[in-house]
C-alpha cells in the first residue's frame, strides 16, 4: 500500500502485487498482479478427502495468476493492451513462450 501511495503522490502509475489493489488509488494503479490464493484454497477444499498434499502449481493455464481489470483502472488499460496481454498469455500457456522456472535451478537468466 505504501508504494501505491508514493506513486499516487508523485502522479505516476503503480502496479499492485498479490491481490487487486486498483481501488486504493483509482486511476493511479495501472493494474494488479493477482496471485489467486482464493482459487487455490477453493480447489483444495473442493477435493475434500481426496486432497493430495504436496506441490500444486497453478499458473496462467490454471488461472492461478493474472491481472486485474475493473472500474478503477478501465480508463488506463486500452482494448489494444488487453488484446496484446491475452495474446502473450496464450503463447505462454501453449508453450510458444518459455518462462524460466526459478524453482528448477535457483537461478534467474536475466542479469
Where is each model-derived feature located?
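A residue-level marker of the well-folded mature domains of exported/periplasmic proteins
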Residues: 1-111
Amino acid at each position: 500500500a505504501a508504494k501505491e501511495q508514493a506513486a499516487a503522490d508523485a502522479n505516476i502509475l503503480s502496479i499492485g502485487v498479490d491481490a487487486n489493489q486498483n481501488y486504493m488509488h483509482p486511476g493511479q494503479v495501472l493494474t494488479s498482479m493477482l496471485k489467486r490464493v482464493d482459487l487455490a484454497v477453493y480447489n483444495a477444499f473442493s477435493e475434500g478427502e481426496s486432497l493430495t498434499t504436496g506441490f500444486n502449481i497453478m499458473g496462467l493455464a490454471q488461472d492461478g495468476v493474472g491481472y486485474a481489470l475493473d472500474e478503477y483502472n478501465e480508463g488506463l488499460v486500452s482494448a489494444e493492451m488487453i488484446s496484446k496481454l491475452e495474446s502473450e498469455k496464450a503463447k505462454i500457456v501453449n508453450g510458444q513462450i518459455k518462462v524460466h522456472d526459478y524453482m528448477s535451478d535457483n537461478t534467474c537468466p536475466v542479469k
